[in-house]
Amino acid sequence: MKLITRNTDYAMRAVCYIAGQDKMSVSAEEMVTRLKIPRPFLRKILQTLSGEGLLKSVKGQGGGFSLACPKEKILLTDLMRIFQNAVQLNECVFKKKICPNRGTCVLKKEIDSIEKDVFRRLRGISIASLMKDGNGSRSRRKGKCYGHSASRH
């Protein structure tokens, strides 16, 4: 079971990096260098995020990417939905086959309950909250997100 895929992680790091910059837009090349994300992956991720309306892109000299909405409004679950489709922690071993225990399976009911709690908590995580350090203040290093330092000087 993998809760966060590599593409979701890369997307989250890129969005955090963009959100932490003071400039109007951030180039893909800058993010490749700073975030150490392979160029082909990053380009596809940025295009997808632009297509989904989370990023704005400007082409040409001085172009790049910027947030299309406030970082407080971009949720980790948005990125998970875009890059992972339906996220499911518990998948019954019988899949879609007929299960004699379908209505009475105690383990499934418990895991479903845990899954609901996990997703309730995930829906409360925004890019802005990921960019804060443990005591709720903005990180001193711009673009710090999810244990990755996007900006090293």
What do the predicted segments below correspond to?
Residues 19-23, 69-70:
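Short helix-capping/hinge SLiMs at alpha-helix to coil transitions
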Residues 18, 45-50:
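Basic amphipathic alpha-helical segments that dock to polyanions
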Residues 40:
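Key DNA-contact positions within bacterial/archaeal DNA-binding proteins
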Residues 96-153:
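C-terminal regulatory/oligomerization modules of transcriptional regulators
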Residues 71-96, 111, 115-116:
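Conserved segment of winged-helix/HTH DNA-binding domains
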Residues 29-36:
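A short alpha-helical element within helix-turn-helix/winged-helix DNA-binding domains
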Residues 53-68:
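Beta-hairpin "wing" of winged helix-turn-helix
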Residues 13-21, 82:
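Short amphipathic alpha-helical elements of helix-turn-helix/winged-helix folds
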